[in-house]
Amino acid sequence: MTSTIYSDALFKLALKEDAIESIIEQFETFVSLARDYPDWIVLLDSPMIRNRVKNKMLTELGIFDALFMNFLMLLVRHHQVRLYEDIYEQWIAKSRLNQKIAYVQLYSAKPLSKKRLNQLKEEIQDYLPGLEIEFNQHIDPTLIEGVKMTYQGRSIERSLKKALDDMRTNI
């Protein structure tokens, strides 16, 4: 709920300022830094460190513009930096929809060829009219064979694991 409020506010402001692309890049940079240095997030969220020290730390990086810095400092002031992953996921979904891109999570037992990826795009294009489809590929050896696609909570699974589970249920 809280992460939705922050992602909505950032999205509306970025839309108003025509800064969607810029914020996407900066948010990706921030997420990458946060994953590489998880203690940094703990530090930014800590009430023991003054906000102006945190602001100075972020400013000294020199990679965030004023709009994104204000957003980060809002999270810092309210001790909500730890929500960055949830906010980022929601932000990406909103920004991709604005750009008419469907970001589909694709799970397979092994990496898929470009030809197979294009076949899958064609198969699901009817379900996502007017959107360009991009896959975020994940390897999941438990699928054994086949694929599972997830988009905004909806899922299509065509895997050997699912077929075996279905047979087991029917027996």
From Swiss-Prot:
Protein's cellular compartments: Cell membrane
InterPro entries given in the database record: ATP_synth_OSCP/delta_N_sf (IPR026015), ATPase_OSCP/dsu (IPR000711)
Main location (coarse class): membrane
GO molecular function: proton-transporting ATP synthase activity, rotational mechanism
Keyword Plastid attached: no
GO CC annotation terms, alphabetical: plasma membrane; proton-transporting ATP synthase complex
Keywords annotated in UniProt: ATP synthesis, Cell membrane, CF(1), Hydrogen ion transport, Ion transport, Membrane, Transport
Domain of life the protein comes from: Bacteria
Membrane topology value: Peripheral membrane protein
HAMAP family: ATP_synth_delta_bact
Family: Belongs to the ATPase delta chain family.
Assembly and oligomerization: F-type ATPases have 2 components, F(1) - the catalytic core - and F(0) - the membrane proton channel. F(1) has five subunits: alpha(3), beta(3), gamma(1), delta(1), epsilon(1). F(0) has three main subunits: a(1), b(2) and c(10-14). The alpha and beta chains form an alternating ring which encloses part of the gamma chain. F(1) is attached to F(0) by a central stalk formed by the gamma and epsilon chains, while a peripheral stalk is formed by the delta and b chains.
Function text: F(1)F(0) ATP synthase produces ATP from ADP in the presence of a proton or sodium gradient. F-type ATPases consist of two structural domains, F(1) containing the extramembraneous catalytic core and F(0) containing the membrane proton channel, linked together by a central stalk and a peripheral stalk. During catalysis, ATP synthesis in the catalytic domain of F(1) is coupled via a rotary mechanism of the central stalk subunits to proton translocation. This protein is part of the stalk that links CF(0) to CF(1). It either transmits conformational changes from CF(0) to CF(1) or is implicated in proton conduction.
Name of the protein in its database record: ATP synthase subunit delta
Organism this protein belongs to: Acholeplasma laidlawii (strain PG-8A)
